[in-house]
């Protein structure tokens, strides 16, 4: 598996991904963030796009590409204990099940899940409603842009790392990213945040996280409305790919329309 290499010229692998509509692919295929790996960069048959925790496999299903450990590669982005694997088609999904459901070294569990995509349509958002949601923050709470201080604070806490975590540093985030947090000013505590998980031409993929101790208070809704409004002001699209039922229901409250569900896998490493 040592001949798996990072693809420097992504134009050579774009054909493998075809017209696959996936919110995380553009960042990789446009060369903005993330990376693509393959066996033969000149005549690739299979490839995987890697960004943050996400792995998107395309082309001819290949077991060695699935087993490749990006932690030991030149991958610039930090890999966590869980990978989210997205297959291009049923053949890839079948190979993923066969490969990781066996007793494979370094893998503790494979969980098959459904994710939910949304329609990309600027006209679906009700700005007045979003402003109403944003202004519903109670007294003592303040919505702040993610500046360098907030960026560093997000990295300090496990629950908020994903808000900014796959950008190289604050300079990289300030150029490509956009985000807000909700601060409890009474104790200077960040309770929730919404930010760009990744960036692509003309848009971002939204990441929303809330401190577990402060969930079910409407904070995610407030942060979600705030970042959508910021994106609309900049003329960029706030893309939303939901990881679970709760996420898609939150998206609907903010104006998104569900497009459909698709199969993905959570791969937990030892």
Short names for language-model regions:
Residues 46, 191-192, 260:
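A structural microfeature
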Residues 208, 238-241:
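Conserved hydrophobic beta-strand within the GNAT/NAT acetyltransferase core sheet
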Residues 64-72, 206, 216-233, 249, ...:
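Conserved acetyl-CoA-binding loop-helix of GNAT-fold acetyltransferases
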Residues 93-105, 221, 243-261:
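Conserved active-site alpha-helix within GNAT-family acetyltransferase domains
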Residues 7-52:
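N-terminal ordered "arm"
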Residues 34-35, 39-151, 265-266:
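Acyl-donor-binding surface of acyltransferase catalytic domains
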Residues 165-186, 190-211:
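A conserved beta-strand-loop-helix scaffold within acyl/acetyltransferase catalytic domains
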Residues 1-22, 121-169:
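Short amphipathic alpha-helix that is part of the acyltransferase structural core
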């Amino acid at each position: 598996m040592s001949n798996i290499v990072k693809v420097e010229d992504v134009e050579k692998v774009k054909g493998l991904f075809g017209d696959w509509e996936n919110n995380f692919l553009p960042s990789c295929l446009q060369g903005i963030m993330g990376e693509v790996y393959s066996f033969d960069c000149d005549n690739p048959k299979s490839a995987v796009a890697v960004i943050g925790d996400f792995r998107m496999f395309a082309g001819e299903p290949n077991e060695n590409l699935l087993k490749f450990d990006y932690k030991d590669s030149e991958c610039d982005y930090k890999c966590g204990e869980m990978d989210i694997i997205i297959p291009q088609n049923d053949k890839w999904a079948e190979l993923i099940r066969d490969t990781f459901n066996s007793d494979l070294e370094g893998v503790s569990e494979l969980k098959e899940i459904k994710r939910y995509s949304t329609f990309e349509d600027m006209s679906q958002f009700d700005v007045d409603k979003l402003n109403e949601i944003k202004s519903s923050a109670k007294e003592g709470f303040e919505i702040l842009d993610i500046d360098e201080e907030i960026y560093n604070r997000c990295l300090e806490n496990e629950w908020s790392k994903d808000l900014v975590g796959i950008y190289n540093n604050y300079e990289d985030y300030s150029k490509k990213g956009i985000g807000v947090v909700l601060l409890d000013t009474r104790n200077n505590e960040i309770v929730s945040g919404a930010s760009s998980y990744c960036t692509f031409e003309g848009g971002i993929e939204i990441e929303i996280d809330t401190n577990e101790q402060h969930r079910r208070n409407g904070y995610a809704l407030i942060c979600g409305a705030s970042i959508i409004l910021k994106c609309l002001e900049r003329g960029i699209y706030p893309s939303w790919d939901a990881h679970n039922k709760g996420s898609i229901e939150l998206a609907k409250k903010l104006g998104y329309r569900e497009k459909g569900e698709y199969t993905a896998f959570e791969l937990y490493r030892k």
